[in-house]
Amino acid sequence: MGKSVVILGAQWGDEGKGKIVDLLTDRVKYVVRYQGGHNAGHTLIINGEKTVLRLIPSGILRENVTCLIGNGVVLSPAALMQEMGELESRGINVRERLLISEACPLILPYHVAMDHAREAALGKNKIGTTGRGIGPAYEDKVARRGLRVGDLFNREAFAEKLKTILDYYNFQLVNYYKAEAVDFQKTLDDVMAVADIITGMVADVTTMLDKARKNGDNILFEGAQGTMLDIDHGTYPFVTSSNTTAGGVATGAGFGPRNLDYVLGIIKAYCTRVGGGPFTTELFDEVGSEIARKGNEFGAVTGRPRRCGWFDAVAIRRAIQLNSISGFCMTKLDVLDGFDEVKICVAYKMPNGDILDYAPLAAKDWEGVEPIYETMPGWKENTFGVTDVNQLPEACRNYVKRIEEVTGVPVDILSTGPDRVETMILRDPFAA
């Protein structure tokens, strides 16, 4: 029997999902994106060569894997063409191995314009979006006015819908935000220039996945961003616009929830966050700066520096609840090499003195929260590239074990470097 495995971020994104997806795709026939858009950069390093994928599933680098983009993904034709071009210039066959749901909402230039206009208007109170039109595209989906991949099959009908929605957006852009209008004809021409390429990759993703499951094929679902950025369960309003949790697989790919066998939560050995929003364990001292430097904590897509802090078991417990996490993959363990001590946040102290074991839901409920830490001895030895768990320093192994104890979830995979070979698989998700 085949296995269906979800890989998702259990923190605030940037946990290293792309590498782990790539690592495990030698076991699968299908890799599926089910939410988000080209706002998430998945960085892969294979034999020293760096690849950043934003929209196309990471399995595209394995020639025997078919990649699917489910209906929960918002798709930018421009971003898709750019990414396909980058991959095809390296000899990677994309068009015959990438299939797209016709129900994917389209991201078009007016979404990007609105994203930028809103963030500029918010000033210091901005959400910290990537400015790629993700949120406005999801808004159109929920408002039932958005254009979808399936609309590309009919140019006349597409043009008519585009005119109506562009009038709606341009009125706001010009009159409220004092921004420039988006040109109708250029938008139409640019999209129609690539319409045949995109429609040529359209498939019934739900039926394909159902057949694959019944055929006993292994399927891997690739999440983007992280659990604490989920539109419903994250630190609202400092969240993304999609469901980043395991439930997104059912709604964003049309795959029944009872058919999932294993949920792999990706966690860093510490925590990072990009943009605004609560971050209880954030470090503002030299330790935080050193973690950022050693971990090269800058966004793969935006280049923005990431905020860094100690491991937060309280937030992780919420992620476990939301996702039914089967096991963890801990990445960037080597970044903690050399510190005299390492810390784990095991509880939150509220301003009224209450102790919380699970993270609050809304951002406002995090105000004044203080972390309660357990402090453990650090290790001076170099763990970069270690591939045998018994070669890790005892203090390092104790740190991993303690995280397992305070979360109640085993660490099944350990990563000690960016290359796919710099990994220890203690329990294979497809054999679990």
From Swiss-Prot:
GO cellular component, one term: cytoplasm
The species this protein was found in: Pasteurella multocida (strain Pm70)
Binding annotation for IMP: D14, E15, G16, K17, N39, A40, G41, H42, T130, R144, Q225, T240, R304
Protein name per its UniProtKB record: Adenylosuccinate synthetase
Annotated InterPro entries: Adenylosuccin_syn_GTP-bd, Adenylosuccin_syn_Lys_AS, Adenylosuccinate_synth_dom1, Adenylosuccinate_synth_dom2, Adenylosuccinate_synth_dom3, Adenylosuccinate_synthetase, P-loop_NTPase
Keywords: Cytoplasm, GTP-binding, Ligase, Magnesium, Metal-binding, Nucleotide-binding, Purine biosynthesis
Catalytic site: D14 (proton acceptor), H42 (proton donor)
Gene3D superfamilies, sorted: Adenylosuccinate Synthetase, subunit A, domain 1, Adenylosuccinate Synthetase, subunit A, domain 2, Adenylosuccinate Synthetase, subunit A, domain 3
GO biological-process terms attached to the record: 'de novo' AMP biosynthetic process; IMP metabolic process
Cofactor(s) listed in the protein's UniProt record: Mg(2+)
Gene name linked to the record: purA
